């Protein structure tokens, strides 16, 4: 269980960082 939980936590963090970077690039392109 701990391995699965940490895996999902890492996946969620990676997804959040990726979406944040994508939004940042989109805002830069809009400017």
Curated annotation (Swiss-Prot):
It comes from the Eukaryota. InterPro entries: Cyt_b6/f_cplx_su6 (IPR007802). The keyword Membrane applies. GO terms for molecular function: electron transporter, transferring electrons within cytochrome b6/f complex of photosystem II activity. Its main location: plastid. One of its GO terms (biological process) is photosynthesis. One of its GO terms (cellular component) is cytochrome b6f complex. Keywords: Chloroplast, Electron transport, Membrane, Photosynthesis, Plastid, Thylakoid, Transmembrane, Transmembrane helix, Transport. It is a single-pass membrane protein. The keyword Transferase does not apply. It is found in: Plastid, Chloroplast thylakoid membrane. Pfam families: PetL. The chain crosses the membrane at residues 4-24. The 4 large subunits of the cytochrome b6-f complex are cytochrome b6, subunit IV (17 kDa polypeptide, PetD), cytochrome f and the Rieske protein, while the 4 small subunits are PetG, PetL, PetM and PetN. The complex functions as a dimer. HAMAP family: Cytb6_f_PetL. Belongs to the PetL family. Component of the cytochrome b6-f complex, which mediates electron transfer between photosystem II (PSII) and photosystem I (PSI), cyclic electron flow around PSI, and state transitions. PetL is important for photoautotrophic growth as well as for electron transfer efficiency and stability of the cytochrome b6-f complex. This is Cytochrome b6-f complex subunit 6. It comes from Gossypium hirsutum (Upland cotton). The lineage of its organism: Eukaryota, Viridiplantae, Streptophyta, Embryophyta, Tracheophyta.
């Amino acid at each position: 269980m701990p391995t699965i939980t940490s895996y999902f936590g890492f996946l969620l963090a990676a997804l959040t960082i990726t979406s944040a970077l994508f939004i940042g690039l989109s805002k830069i392109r809009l400017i």
